[in-house]
């Protein structure tokens, strides 16, 4: 879980546009962010296994 200060800092507009970065909407994690779903890999996996993300199925071959 990210610190509240980092989450708040990421939400406000940066002084320069290059400084903007993505954070997970659920936990605030900045690394392993999946743009299409707006969350980190850990939250993505949890939500996918619970069936909360439509169209995502676990792959097996």
UniProtKB/Swiss-Prot annotation:
Keywords: Metal-binding, Ribonucleoprotein, Ribosomal protein, RNA-binding, rRNA-binding, Zinc. InterPro entries: Ribosomal_uS14, Ribosomal_uS14_bact, Ribosomal_uS14_CS, Ribosomal_uS14_sf. One of its GO terms (molecular function) is structural constituent of ribosome. It comes from the Bacteria. Its cofactor is Zn(2+). Disulfide bonds: none annotated. GO terms for biological process: translation. Zn(2+) binds at residues 24, 27, 40, 43. GO terms for cellular component: cytoplasm; small ribosomal subunit. PROSITE patterns: RIBOSOMAL_S14 (PS00527). Binds 1 zinc ion per subunit. The keyword Repeat does not apply. Part of the 30S ribosomal subunit. Contacts proteins S3 and S10. Belongs to the universal ribosomal protein uS14 family. Zinc-binding uS14 subfamily. Binds 16S rRNA, required for the assembly of 30S particles and may also be responsible for determining the conformation of the 16S rRNA at the A site. NCBIfam families: PRK08061.1. This is Small ribosomal subunit protein uS14. It comes from Chloroflexus aurantiacus (strain ATCC 29366 / DSM 635 / J-10-fl).
């Amino acid at each position: 879980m990210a610190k509240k200060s980092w989450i708040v800092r990421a939400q406000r507009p940066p002084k320069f546009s290059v400084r903007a970065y993505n954070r997970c909407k659920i936990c605030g994690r900045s690394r392993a962010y999946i743009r299409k779903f707006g969350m980190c890999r850990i939250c993505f996996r949890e939500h996918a296994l619970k069936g909360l993300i439509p169209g995502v199925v676990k792959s097996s071959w």
